Amino acid sequence: MRFADRPTTEVDVFVAAPPERIWPLVSEINTPSQFGTELQKAVWLEVEGLEGPPPCPGARFTGHNFHAARGEWQTTNVIIDCEPNQVFAWAVGDDPSFPAATWRYELTPEGDGTRLRFRAQMGPGPSGMTAVIEQMPDKEERIIARRLDEWAANMTATLTGIKEQAEDGA
């Protein structure tokens, strides 16, 4: 697996609640910071000419992150898809057409509840990880696999937290 292949990871969970109860949790940019270990907080940025309040497409936020191997850093993020009760997605970086990563929640009604998916894709734009790969190109596959595992663990923790909160509100 190479960075040029735009590696992805996806996790999902069944939530015994309707999409309308889950939506406020997935569209709240600080939800992952409540359950995962990397995102510490997120802050909306002002954007002139925005056609509505966040989290509408084009809205931007700063992500404040921490990783034991890297320390602290910030990212600019842009909402790229926002369909209430269905999809919430953002791109990492100033240029959403060339992001460092893309993150996406999808809510699909299923029986008496909702199938909640959380997907993340690396690239195609540069990130802190691409600099590490450039320094150790022979370890690219291992670096990517480890990073995808870290992402999946945080994503799973986030979905578990969302599930518990949404079902507690039942």
Label each residue range with its predicted role.
Residues 21-26, 32, 61, 79, ...:
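Hydrophobic pocket/interface hotspot
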Residues 18-21, 150, 154:
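Short amphipathic alpha-helical segments
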Residues 15, 65, 120-122:
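Hydrophobic beta-strand positions in extracellular immunoglobulin-like domains
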Residues 93-153:
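Beta-strand/loop substructures that line and gate deep hydrophobic ligand-binding cavities in soluble
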Residues 1-56:
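Hydrophobic ligand-binding cavity/cleft-lining segments
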Residues 16, 82-84, 110:
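Structural motif
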Residues 12-16, 78, 106:
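Generic structural detector for well-ordered beta-strands
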